[in-house]
Design a protein with these regions (language model features):
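Conserved active-site segment of CheY-like receiver
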Residues: 9, 81-85, 104-106
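Short amphipathic alpha-helix used as the core "switch/output" element in two-component signaling
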Residues: 63-75
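Helix-turn-helix DNA-binding segment
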Residues: 141-178
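Short, flexible helix-to-coil linker/hinge segments that flank and couple to helix-turn-helix
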Residues: 90-94, 100-147
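Active-site residues of response regulator receiver
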Residues: 54-55, 82
Length: 208
């Protein structure tokens, strides 16, 4: 029995995806998660054969969730399900080892075809995007490894730095001491191999 995890914070879309997959691939066992923490918990405690991941859900509003999961579960087949048509972003998604990109506008048959192809070990992209997406984005792949080493708390601090907040403001938003924020910033700089906030902002901007 093949078990698939749908990770998306929109219950209506999860229901629609579940319905489409149940009709086309009735042998699948389907699990659901609505945020990054729940997704990681399920992956830690259950045998999942394929993860269908939305990039934008609580715990991750950009590529961090994908990078975090790829770091924790490097052997897990992952496909991103998203409404974006940004080929640069899709190229980044594929470059970090993701096996597929499924548009949220895809038909039930296309979704089933994608799942079957990915379970067979193939990379699946929609026909209209396959020629435009550069699968070998080595520069971003190297950056992704560094970003994936951040903890979720460090990632939140990095996002606030990207938004231009000072340490005191970040501490207020996260309800932590300013000294703790400074410790996170130091760790972020070390893990990313940088030495100032401007460089951190440039890196964070590439995750959007």
């Amino acid at each position: 029995m093949i078990t698939l995890l749908i990770a998306d914070d929109h219950p209506l879309y999860r229901d629609a995806l579940r319905g489409a997959l149940s009709l086309s691939l009735p042998a699948l066992t389907l699990k659901e998660a609505g945020d990054l923490n729940t997704t990681v918990d399920i992956l830690n405690n259950e045998d999942i054969d394929l993860l269908l991941l939305d990039l934008h859900m609580p715990g991750s509003n950009d590529l961090f969730g994908l990078l975090h999961i790829r770091k924790l579960f490097p052997e897990l087949p992952v496909a991103v399900v998203s409404g974006t048509e940004d080929t640069t972003l899709i190229s980044k998604i594929i470059s970090v080892g993701t096996l597929g990109f499924i548009p949220k506008t895809a038909s039930a048959q296309d979704i089933a075809n994608a799942v079957e192809a990915i379970l067979d070990g193939d990379v699946w992209l929609p026909d209209n995007l396959s020629e435009d997406v550069d699968e070998l984005n080595e520069e971003f792949s190297e950056l992704a490894d560094k970003v994936a080493s951040l903890t979720p708390s460090q990632y939140k601090v990095l996002c606030y730095m990207r938004d231009g907040l000072l340490n005191k403001q970040i501490g207020f938003n996260l309800d932590i001491a300013e000294a703790t924020v400074k410790a996170h910033v130091t760790a972020i700089f070390k893990k990313l191999g940088i030495n100032n906030r401007t460089q951190a902002v440039l890196i964070a901007s590439q995750l959007e």
